[in-house]
Amino acid sequence: MNPLRSIQHNIATPPISGGQPLDAVGPQAQQSHPKRISPSQLSQSAHQALERLSANAEHQRLASLVRNALQDGTFQFQSSNHTQVTYKASICLPADTDTVRTDHLINNELTVQARLNDQSEYDIVSAHLHGSSKAISFDVPSPPPAHGSASSVLSERTHLGMSRVLSQDAVDSSSLETPLLSSPDHSRPPSQPKPVHIGSVRRDSGSLVSDNPVVQALLSFAQADQAFPPQAASIAGVQLEMRPRRDIEKALEEFKGAFTVVKAQLMSGANSSERVDEDVNADIHIPLLLKAIERGAAAFGPNASIGQNSAKAFLASCAPKITSNDDVLSEFINQKLKGDDDLQVRLGAQELLHVATKKEFQLGGLAGSIGVSSILGSAWELGASELLKNAIFGKNFSPSQYALQLAGIDSVPPLIIESMDTMCVLAIIKGMKGEEWSMSDLLPKALKAGAISSVVSFPNNVLQYAGFKSRVGDLAANSVTTEAAIFGAASGIPPEVKESEELMRAGLFQSMKDGVMAHSGEGVDTKKTIERMTRHALDIAPGESTAVKSMGLASIVGMIPLIASNKATGLLSEQVLRIFRSAVFNPIEAIALNALALGGRVNVPGLFDSDNAKHARVVQTILARASQHMEAGDRDISAEELHQMLAPRSEFLRHVGSAIVNGMNASFEAIPALVRKLGYGEAPLAERIPYQDLAVPDTSRQPAP
């Protein structure tokens, strides 16, 4: 008696066969069976059943062994009765499940029970794997007859159940029941994350190859110093997946929390030889992850830890796991990865970096910005402006006569509109960074930006009423003042980027001082190293990088009203332009931020890469470097090489936006710098970082081992 029958649970699935005899008076009793059974002799339903089993994590191993043995022709006739036939194959498996070395293989007995159907094809009834220490099996019981003949019953519905039995004495009475579902997607546990990289695998000239570049790089690494077992990918339809091993978003939060620098020892504003602890709350997780990809575990100092785990162990636990419908293949690769700590650290860091740099659409901030600009801007442009001016100057006043007064009136609304819009823009940036924010934090920055916008818009407003006689000169002057007005409207962004840059520099300095991040080494300019790390991190950080690019986009799109006006091409009427200014021009930064976030998901080969494509290239490079250099010390990726993959030089908007942001910050800093030269005010944070202190590691702040 089959010990599994008593615990079988049945579920409805697609048919296993087109017609299946339920008694002895069918083809089973009329025909002798071949000495060997091959895949071509199986029914389509049997092939489908094996496919579904291969997608089930509990039964991948057994299904793969059955398919491989069928393909190799190693199943030999064993016995038969009036209902079914048994085939047996001897196969080699690792004696120790934690190793795949060929010198540890032992013989195991694989048997399948099959039944010949009305089409003279074999349906698989059950399969069993017996070894010295365990047995694995699944059964396909027959359904009870109903509504006529067996063929009609089975063509409509077949009940299929499976059981997996693990024991110390071949088979015991305990089992773990897993239903066979109708598709790989359904067989995946709900909590199991979707694969990040997936590709088909096939054999070619003795090696395994894939159509996916990342999977191909993984295969190249796995077979760099040892060939795959002959059973691996020996049949068609094999797929390999790289999927997260754990909840990556939760892991990222743990990593960020562990490496947020709360205080930094900076120079005192009064005396540069004194050190004071200053609150910085610097987020340095992105530069640390970049450094871990570049150098592996060597990126961290002796005090880098997350809870009770070292940074190295934590990142290794975040490395992706490999799954496949060929369990021999996935087991072989997972064991190769398991034995390479350096590679796991780099892959784990890349997994976290991919999530850390993901740009999310910020609907709330965008809606707020458009709402403020559309309501207040349209109310001013289409009604309030004309009513107020007519009330002050009369209905038939001459605009050129009162140009300065009119420009002054037009410069007042930006103080309100741009202040509220800047609040929305800064909230979007904070949201992209995953940071909490409050009105009290953003309001002073927003009011300052609104005041700047009001002042800077004045020259452009004057030219709307009193231009130059020369059309070329008038157009040139309007172009300059329009760009100035655009920059003024976005004046809340550059200081935000600068603040992030200064805090990150201070955080990296302190982490290196405390032995969290590895010291840059003797003869290396530490200041330049930290500045480069900061620049590379901000170029891919979701908030800052998008903000910088939005400045470049706004500087281009913001010129449309001028180009379409009667000062240039005259394509649009003044009424239409007023609506455009209210609906598009005023909230251009918020629109640009979200447009760029969505644009990061678009991939056009040969033109620009999506964020996913960039990170896939990083994974491919990590694996390729590991294949070329089996020693961890020879695998380092240069900072510039990694930066080029994630932030290519071809990113036009980033270069334009960076020039604008740096120029605006320099102009904002001009007057405070002059005041400091006169002996007033305190040096900015960036100038109070004592890089010279890193010449000797600070052991006083390091915890005892």
UniProtKB/Swiss-Prot annotation:
What broad class describes the main subcellular location of this protein? Answer: secreted
Q: Is Secreted tagged as a keyword?
A: yes
Region span, Disordered: 1-41, 173-207
Residue spans with biased composition (Low complexity)? 173-184
**One GO CC term, this protein:** extracellular region
InterPro entries per UniProt: Plant_immune_effector
Biological process according to GO: symbiont-mediated perturbation of host programmed cell death
Q: Does the keyword Secreted apply?
A: yes
Which keywords does the record carry? Hypersensitive response elicitation, Secreted, Virulence
Q: Where is the composition biased (Polar residues)?
A: 1-11, 28-41
Provide the protein's localization. Answer: Secreted
Q: What does the record give as the function of this protein?
A: Effector protein involved in non-host recognition.
Official protein name in the record = Effector protein hopD1
Provenance organism: Pseudomonas syringae pv. tomato (strain ATCC BAA-871 / DC3000)
